[in-house]
Design a protein with these regions (language model features):
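Alpha-helical solenoid repeat scaffolds of the TPR/TPR-like class and their adjacent stem/linker regions
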Residues: 1-694, 699-763
């Protein structure tokens, strides 16, 4: 967050006497180069100029500017009028016009220091930093003890990342004026930029000893306290600044940022709404408001606020980077990456942008690049807690679980862990088989942030994986607050059914909420709900509709997106286990709760009659966009040992990836059969599955279809498998005819492939 404005305000600031005004008002200092005017007009010009400068000092800028223009109408080359009219243009946001006017004044009197300092301020406003620095240098060459120029140059150097040089300027100011509260607080800002927080705080405290009611120093002290993690003290400092100056927008902005850090986003938003109302051109407030709106899980509004900030500061790297974060929240990682790359083009060494780029790359399933982005950030700042946590996330994506845990632990040593960091560390522990430690970590995250949905949800998944269904299904309900899942939440006017009241004679909507495999697994509960005497509406994804029409005697089917009639209750499919208090022994686990269409089965039987037995259906990869696809899918080439066997292998893939195309074409020449062009929906696939002798599949919707049909199925699982497959078991209570074969080494499928070959008599 920015501290308060630090550049010396030109000439008319109410906080100090203006060197410009004091050196240009007297008649004895009248511009010797000005065109002579008639004697009777001289007094009129002088009076007009004096009145204009008085109005300027009072802040009545429009009237002052009118006065300066009148003077220039009489005397076009009046140095003072040109200079101060330029200053007034700067103060009214017209920096380009200010530059032109002040440069005209300098041509008339090139040895005056004040115009160069004010010219530098106008260049700063246009982000023409090198020209601004040159102007401040010129002012100080003319007057090495010019405090305003030292102040302005110091602040510019600090903004340019040259904090050590800035500190030297503020020390020079203090040598000239030891009791300058402004120099002391600006010195504190330079020290803060150098990472010397304790010294910075001391400098701000000294400023407040000199001037206890100095809002700027209170605001700057608050920024240091916030950086030190002393949030309550920081908030008190900002509040004190605002008591003294209620319209202090920088303090309002920093107060909001601190409230955001304190997990009080609603209060933060109140401060920010006041800030943007007071200063609609203050980009930092719109940026902070975006941060708070993200915390309030309002990503669309956050993105709009960031874009308002960008309209005001189009070359601000941090705002571009924050736009990227909001776009990631909105599941638009491609656009996010474009915004973040724009930030890095402006500021290549932005730690925030490098971290956000890593997040976008992870969302794009490009974890290797994400890891490299984190490493770049850590080269620039080895103690960046955010970069270490993000590196752990990328390592977790890559299956480098122990390395991820090491990254999280190092981050914990360097700074207090956030709820997100504790949650990610717990995921690593879970993947390492340290489930009780993982649950303790999730609990810590919840203690830190009570409503942190991800921690609750992941804890639920961990408990489900352990077979603790009672607690697991309860916490699984937190999914509706998790970004990426909550967007699928349905808002109905009717009540969510959670097991009570009785359903006899009532109408309930059961609806698909996640993937196709989830719908296939949990549609079994239709019969359980029907047994309660309910009238059922069942809403499913379009590819499943023909297959699930077999429920039409118990439920009226709808495709997602169709208009729905009135109903009394609703329940998403994956909330039904909680509603029915499902535990391991009570899972509805009929051997085959789905059947294929008999007419389609007859056709497939005829088509397969001429193929060598056994006929084995295989699925080696799932949806490439699935979050765990890297770990659950197998490169087809690795299955080569199977294709030397005396058997027919039938591809059950919806599509073949380009990375598998070469192996696929080669295996087709050695007997792999592909019927993809004849499989239009799941009813077609179900009929084909019914006719094969066995299915061998990775964890995808095809596995659930085979299990639901009661086919002998071998499921190939990564070491860190999905919660529904529990731990270590070779069977599953969900599908009695399914056998599970698990990796023993993360990412290594060789042993699994060998075990399958042996179990099928293929070696």
């Amino acid at each position: 967050m920015p501290a308060s404005p630090r550049y010396a305000a030109p000439t008319s600031s109410p906080e100090r006497k203006s060197n410009v005004l004091s050196t240009t008002m007297g008649e004895d200092q009248a511009d010797s180069k000005s065109r002579p005017v008639q004697a009777d007009q001289q007094a009129q010009v002088t009076a007009c100029l004096q009145q204009a400068t008085a109005l300027h000092a009072q802040g009545t800028l429009d009237a002052a500017m009118a006065g300066y223009r009148q003077v220039l109408a009489w005397r076009p080359d009046d140095f003072t009028a040109l200079h101060l009219l330029g200053v007034a243009h700067y103060q009214t946001g017209q920096a380009a016009a200010a530059i032109e006017l002040i440069q005209q004044a300098i041509e008339l009197q090139p040895l005056q220091a004040a115009p160069y300092s004010n010219l530098g301020l106008a260049f700063v406003a246009l982000r023409r930093d090198s020209e601004a620095l040159q102007s401040f240098n010129q002012a100080l060459q003319l007057d090495s003890k010019y405090l305003e120029a030292l102040n302005n140059r110091g602040n510019l150097l600090n903004d340019m990342g040259r904090a050590a040089e800035a500190l030297a300027d503020f020390d020079r100011m203090l040598a000239l004026k030891p009791d300058s509260a402004e120099a002391l607080t600006h010195r504190g800002m330079a020290l803060q930029a150098l990472g010397r927080s304790k010294a910075a705080l001391s400098s701000h405290e000294l400023a407040l000893q000199v001037r206890p009611d100095y809002p700027k120093a209170l605001n700057n002290r608050g920024t240091v306290l916030r950086d030190m993690g002393r949030l309550a003290a920081a908030l008190a400092s900002f509040d004190r600044a605002l008591v003294l100056r209620p319209d202090f927008v920088e303090a309002l902005n920093n107060r909001a940022a601190t409230l955001h850090d304190m997990q009080r986003p609603a209060e933060a938003l109140e401060s920010l709404e006041r800030a943007v109302q007071l200063a609609p051109h203050y980009a930092e407030a719109f940026n902070t408001r975006g941060n708070v709106l993200r915390e309030l899980q309002r990503p669309e509004a956050a993105l709009a606020s960031y874009r308002q900030a960008l309209q005001l500061k189009p070359d601000d790297a941090l705002i571009w980077s924050n736009c990227g974060s909001a776009l990631c929240d909105l599941q638009r990682p491609g656009e996010a990456l474009v915004n973040i790359e724009r930030a890095l083009a402006i500021q290549p060494e932005s730690i925030e942008a490098l971290n956000n780029r890593a997040n976008a790359l992870r969302d794009l399933k490009r974890p290797e690049e994400a890891l490299r982005s984190c490493e770049q950030a850590l080269q620039l700042k080895p103690d960046s807690v955010a970069a270490l946590n993000n590196r752990g996330n990328a390592q977790l994506d890559l299956g480098q679980t122990q390395a991820a845990l090491d990254s999280y632990d190092l981050a914990r040593q360097l700074g207090p862990a956030s709820a997100a960091a504790l949650t990610n560390r717990s995921l690593a522990l879970q993947q390492l088989g340290r489930h009780e430690e993982a649950l303790a970590g999730f609990a810590q995250a919840v203690q830190l942030l009570t409503d942190y949905a991800q921690a609750h949800w992941y804890a639920g998944l961990c408990r489900l994986q352990l077979g603790n269904f009672a607690a697991g299904w309860r916490q699984y309900e937190w999914r509706w607050q998790v970004p990426g899942i909550k967007t699928g939440r349905r808002d109905f006017t009717t009540a969510l059914w959670s097991g009570d009241p009785p359903l006899q004679g009532q109408t309930i909507l059961l609806y698909a909420e996640q993937g196709l495999g989830d719908t296939l697994q949990f549609c079994r509960y239709v019969d359980v709900v029907a047994a309660r005497g309910a009238r059922i509406y069942l809403e499913v994804q379009a590819p499943l509709r023909p297959l699930l029409e077999q429920y039409s005697d118990r439920a009226r089917l709808f495709t997602v997106g169709e208009s729905l009639p009135q109903f009394d209750y609703h329940c998403p499919l994956l909330s039904l286990p909680l509603a029915f208090h499902t535990d391991l022994p009570s899972i509805p686990s009929q051997t085959a709760y789905l059947q294929a269409d008999s007419a389609k089965v007859a056709i497939w039987k005829q088509r397969l009659a001429h193929y060598q037995r056994p006929v084995i259906g295989i699925i080696w990869s799932g949806n490439s966009q699935h979050g765990n696809d890297r770990h659950r899918s197998i490169p087809l080439a690795q299955l080569a040992p199977w294709f030397s066997a005396k058997a027919t292998f039938v591809s059950l893939q919806n599509e073949v990836r380009e990375t598998d195309r070469e192996a696929f074409d080669a295996f087709r020449r050695h007997g792999l059969v592909d019927f993809a062009q004849d499989l239009h929906d799941f009813s077609d696939t179900a009929a084909l599955l019914t006719c094969v002798d066995r299915v061998v599949t990775v964890d995808t919707s095809g596995a659930h279809l085979a299990g639901a049909l009661g086919k002998p199925t071998t499921l190939l699982l990564p070491q860190n498998a999905d919660f529904r497959w529990l731990l270590e078991r070779t069977d599953t209570p969900w599908y009695p005819t399914m056998r599970l074969i698990r990796q023993t080494t993360p990412g290594d499928w060789r042993e699994v492939i060998s075990v399958v070959a042996a179990s099928l008599g293929l070696r």
